[in-house]
């Protein structure tokens, strides 16, 4: 045996026996199984574990039960199966020493060729399936140019007439105009939509592919029909794509593009041609929808009901963000029962107070009164007019003959009828919108009443305050004037004349700068060559010494001026004030005392003045020394 198996290249001679020695031969899993007689069977495990079912009656697979069944198949086998296998082995005994080969033997090269053929066959099938799902590629000829254009093969669940109006108006030439855009249902669309209203989406979408199913899955599948399981999975989260034929679903979604078509009414042929040349074959935003435009012969009419139309460019337009999965994605979703995008936006948008007041849901709710109700109202009006006659309506058209035949009519109103009408109106059920409006009206009414009460209360408070103010007004007028005067004086006093930033400038409030005046006074006392004439500021202020308002400044001792104080400013005006004060003091003393007393007083005054002058000279000398 060792000689029959050639040594493989690159293998050590010491390990050559691995390929021929039976000790190293791998045992089959089949030989490890334990043989069981007829007393034991797989059905015992199935009976032991009862399968649970979901709300649709389908069995729920339990991982533990499946594991036990798999272990049973792995480690046990029946006697009958073993006997059958032994018979088969006995019949098919192959003498490998003579070069015989079993019937089911397949070489590696054959495996590769067979796998290639299978894969090529599968690819051919897939390519055929993909070729089946296509849009209408063979576009007819454009034909003669006309004023009107037809737009086909768009996602009409999201595209509205106002979207087309906004898009095409960008390509209108000067002098042209789009009169209106209308969307009509096609014959194919009407037939399909009528069928879907009764049956729903086509049942072909939910058929299972049982070609490649394994035997295990066939055993675990229930007896439910493919149609029922598909519809159930459609409403289960995460199971919608399991039993849906993706190819049929894609074809259905592409067919929905042909349910409607739009007609663009242009003012002239130049406008329609410009739109056709610029838009045909282009993509609408990033939705994967390509504009497919066709010329419509002039004079062609459309009798179908208009789904929606647009004749004026809408204000505050916002395009819808969407994409058609059937045109660009591998996974396609069923949009048959999808909520319209407009309704979702209306539900999510926050309404203003005005929009709540004028809430209009006509597009989604049926109106309370139809045309038949209007006809009934007209008939009731005509009947009442016939009962009342010409009384109060055609009095100007009466003729003398009519006066002879005139008959008085008595009209009585019974309160019972009015009460009945009230009861009938009360018996009517209130809709949700009416309930919202009623509550909003009550809320607004309560808010207005509250605001009104607050206004009345504030007016009362104002009146009471005004009364109290009027009483105190006479007493407070004098205080207000005093406060104003003191405020003005404080503003002048609080002005900072020593501010470094404002030095050299005139104070706008006081109309002078005291620092500049003092510097100029010092410069005047210097000798001519040391003077800085450009810094000399002329003090043009002349105090009114005869003003009676400043009488106390010159006569009262409380306003005495001490030149030795550091706050003293030796200006021309201040010197005049000092002279005037001393003059008036002297005159006062002369009037009060005799001539002798006056002489002594004058001498004393002169001495005092002399002392003051000496003190000032000493201070000035000391200050000069310090500066040097």
Swiss-Prot record:
Residues 208-218, 440-450, 463-472, 582-592, 615-628 have a biased composition (Basic residues). It comes from the Eukaryota. It is found in: Nucleus, Nucleolus. Residues 119-135, 492-501 have a biased composition (Acidic residues). Interacts with KRR1, NOP1, NSR1, PUF6 and UTP22, proteins involved in 18S rRNA synthesis. Also interacts with ribosomal proteins RPS1, RPS3, RPS4, RPS6, RPS11, RPL2, RPL3, RPL4, RPL7, RPL10, RPL20 and RPP0 as well as with the snoRNAs U3 and U14. Involved in the 18S rRNA synthesis. Required for the early cleavages at sites A0, A1 and A2. Present with 656 molecules/cell in log phase SD medium. This is Pre-rRNA-processing protein ESF1. It comes from Saccharomyces cerevisiae (strain ATCC 204508 / S288c) (Baker's yeast). The lineage of its organism: Eukaryota, Fungi, Dikarya, Ascomycota, Saccharomycotina.
């Amino acid at each position: 045996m060792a000689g029959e198996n050639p040594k493989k290249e690159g293998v050590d001679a010491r390990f050559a026996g691995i390929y021929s020695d039976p000790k190293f031969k791998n045992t089959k899993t089949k030989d490890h199984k334990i043989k069981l007689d007829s007393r034991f069977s797989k059905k015992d495990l199935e009976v032991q574990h009862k399968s649970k079912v979901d709300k649709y009656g389908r069995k729920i697979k339990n991982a533990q039960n499946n594991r036990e069944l798999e272990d049973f198949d792995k480690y046990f086998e029946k006697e009958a199966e073993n006997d059958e296998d032994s018979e088969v082995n006995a019949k098919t005994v192959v003498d490998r020493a003579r070069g015989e080969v079993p019937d089911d033997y397949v070489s590696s090269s054959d495996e590769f060729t067979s796998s290639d053929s299978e894969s090529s066959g599968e690819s051919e099938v897939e390519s055929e399936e993909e070729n089946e799902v296509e849009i209408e590629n063979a576009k007819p000829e454009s034909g003669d140019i006309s004023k009107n254009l037809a737009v086909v093969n768009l996602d009409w669940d999201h595209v509205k007439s106002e979207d087309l109006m906004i898009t095409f108006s960008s390509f209108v030439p000067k002098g042209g105009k789009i009169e209106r855009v209308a969307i009509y249902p096609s014959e194919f669309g009407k037939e399909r939509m009528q069928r879907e209203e009764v049956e729903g989406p086509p049942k072909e979408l939910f058929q299972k592919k049982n070609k490649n199913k394994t035997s295990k899955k066939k055993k675990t599948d229930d007896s439910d029909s493919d149609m029922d399981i598909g519809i159930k999975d459609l409403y289960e989260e995460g199971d919608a794509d399991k039993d849906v034929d993706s190819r049929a679903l894609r074809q259905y979604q592409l067919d929905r593009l042909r349910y409607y078509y739009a007609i663009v009414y242009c003012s002239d042929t130049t406008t329609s041609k410009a739109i056709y040349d610029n838009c045909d074959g282009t993509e609408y935003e990033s939705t994967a929808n390509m504009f497919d435009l066709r010329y419509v012969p002039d004079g062609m009419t459309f009798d179908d009901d208009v789904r929606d139309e647009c004749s004026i460019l809408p204000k505050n337009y916002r395009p819808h963000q969407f994409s058609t999965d059937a045109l660009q994605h591998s996974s396609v979703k069923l949009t048959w029962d999808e909520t319209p995008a407009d309704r979702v936006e209306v539900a999510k948008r926050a309404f203003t107070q005005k929009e709540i007041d004028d809430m209009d849901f006509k597009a989604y709710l049926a109106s309370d009164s139809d045309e038949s109700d209007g006809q009934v109202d007209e008939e009731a009006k005509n009947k009442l007019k016939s009962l009342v006659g010409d009384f109060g309506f055609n009095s100007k058209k009466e003729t003398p003959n009519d006066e002879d035949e005139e008959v008085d009519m008595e009209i009585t109103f019974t309160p019972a009828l009015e009460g009945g009408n009230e009861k009938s109106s009360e018996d009517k059920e209130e809709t949700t919108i009416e309930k919202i409006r009623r509550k909003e009206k009550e809320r607004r009414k309560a808010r207005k009443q509250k605001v009104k009460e607050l206004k009345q209360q504030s007016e009362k408070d104002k009146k009471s305050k005004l009364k109290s103010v009027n009483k105190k007004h006479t007493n407070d007028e004098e205080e207000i004037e005093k406060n104003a005067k003191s405020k003005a004086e404080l503003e002048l006093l609080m002005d900072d004349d020593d501010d470094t930033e404002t030095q050299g400038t005139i104070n706008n409030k006081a109309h002078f700068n005291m620092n500049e005046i003092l510097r100029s006074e010092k410069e005047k006392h210097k000798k001519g060559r040391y003077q800085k004439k450009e810094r000399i500021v002329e003090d043009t202020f002349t105090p009114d010494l005869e003003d009676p308002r400043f009488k106390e400044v010159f006569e009262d001792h409380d306003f005495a001026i001490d030149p030795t104080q550091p706050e003293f400013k030796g200006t021309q005006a201040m010197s005049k004030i000092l002279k005037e004060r001393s003059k008036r003091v002297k005159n006062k003393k002369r009037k009060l005392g005799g001539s002798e007393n006056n002489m002594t007083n004058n001498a004393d005054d002169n001495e005092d003045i002399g002392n003051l002058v000496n003190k000032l000279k000493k201070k000035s000398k000391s200050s000069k020394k310090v500066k040097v």
